[in-house]
């Protein structure tokens, strides 16, 4: 699971999800990638689940890059607790994903295998996404 080792502040404000991504919008490491089309908080468990789905499908070939990191804590108060008396304790770690952001990249396999692996990973994520291919003259 992806979790920060140390954080300066244990509890943070919820990050805004409006607007498009300004960086990380192109496939830069691999040949194929997953690009977000809608905003969402992606938890560390969802990232790990998508990674496992991809690596199981490509078996031993290929390489996977994870371009997002869950660096924001989301808090939750216990069940049947009255309102007030402070903010709840951190429950999950999330990555704030904005539209246009490339989440995962993949290379080293042929196109059919890559597309199927990325399709399986998209189903594990709580957002709309598409499969993109690297641009440029490689």
Swiss-Prot record:
PANTHER family: 50S/60S RIBOSOMAL PROTEIN L16, LARGE RIBOSOMAL SUBUNIT PROTEIN UL16M. It comes from Paenarthrobacter aurescens (strain TC1). Keywords: Ribonucleoprotein, Ribosomal protein, RNA-binding, rRNA-binding, tRNA-binding. The gene is rplP. Residues 1-24 are annotated as: Disordered. GO terms for cellular component: cytosolic large ribosomal subunit. InterPro entries: Ribosomal_uL16, Ribosomal_uL16_bact-type, Ribosomal_uL16_CS, Ribosomal_uL16_dom, Ribosomal_uL16_sf. It comes from the Bacteria. This is Large ribosomal subunit protein uL16.
């Amino acid at each position: 699971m992806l979790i920060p080792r140390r954080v300066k502040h244990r509890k943070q404000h919820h990050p805004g999800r409006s607007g498009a991504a300004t960086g990380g919008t192109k496939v830069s490491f691999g040949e194929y990638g997953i690009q977000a089309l809608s905003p969402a908080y992606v938890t560390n468990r969802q990232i790990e689940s998508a990674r496992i789905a991809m690596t199981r499908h490509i078996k031993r070939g290929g390489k996977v890059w994870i371009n997002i990191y869950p660096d924001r804590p989301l808090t939750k108060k216990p069940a049947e607790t009255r309102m007030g008396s402070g903010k709840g304790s951190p429950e999950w770690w999330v990555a704030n994903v904005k539209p246009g952001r490339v989440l995962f990249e993949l290379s080293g396999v042929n196109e059919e295998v890559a597309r199927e692996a990325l399709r399986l990973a998209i189903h594990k994520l709580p957002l709309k996404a598409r499969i993109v291919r690297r641009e440029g003259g490689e």
